[in-house]
């Protein structure tokens, strides 16, 4: 079957490319905020719903006319910023999520997405470069090859200052061989999860080491003069430590979910209301640490890819 897979690479833009990326982040944030304000104003004045197409037309006809510098960045990036705003707006109405917030330039994670058209995005594994709209060829660490059709590229900068690009590819995926083994999963706090046949997936102990480093660095930061050179150096160390924890955890979850999906045809787990549970301050950190949401998310899409059945049951369902 054909599936969408994302391949994430670290990129090393030169000074000119970094300026263009920063400009695109800023323009996307500006367009997101302006179209959100426009949508809010129309609804308050006329009680009319505004579609994402209306917002896109408003950007092209009004905003680009008033703010010429918007034409200096990739047009697909601006359109996708509007579509992201629309998705947040739809979530507010359909899923009763919080009302979309205006984006701040102080956000730690910055990103924009551009679409593939007429070969404007290309990955060259021989030269180790990625071609992107308005950036030309950017140096990259291309550690994984892929085959398939590029659909989009998301350029991001994390709080440690590193740049990445995530290439979304439509690729053919070979399903795993059928198995007659079925399993139930009990999500835990002491351990990540325990399967119905007694297998225990422990929480990673190595993360504790980095969490201790984090506490030490945060203590150091509180003693630094704000906006001093050492303050920013320590902030960067904290960001790198967070990144290390995030990467170790995600890599481990991929290994666990792959093993569970490979060995079982039907996988059953509890349908936990994680958002509500995180509101309990005594449980919040423990739940975030064991990453239930990310594990169940991975099990869900990997089951679809491999012809497996993943079922979430009510927490209080009497399985006996």
Where are these regions (language model features)?
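Gly/serine-rich nucleotide phosphate-binding loop at the start of the catalytic core
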Residues: 1-78
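TRNA-binding/sensing appendages of the translation machinery
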Residues: 11, 85, 299
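Positively charged, helix-rich recognition surfaces that bind polyanionic ligands
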Residues: 144-146, 159-320
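Short, Φ-rich (hydrophobic/aromatic) sequence segments
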Residues: 28-39, 81-89, 93, 214
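Acidic carboxylate diad motif detector
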Residues: 54-158, 289
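Generic detection of short hydrophobic beta-strand segments and adjacent strand-loop junctions
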Residues: 9-11, 137-140, 200-203
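Short, surface-exposed charged micro-motifs
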Residues: 10, 120-122, 152-155, 182-184, ...
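Hydrophobic (often cysteine-bearing) scaffold residues that line and stabilize catalytic clefts
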Residues: 17, 21, 28, 74, ...
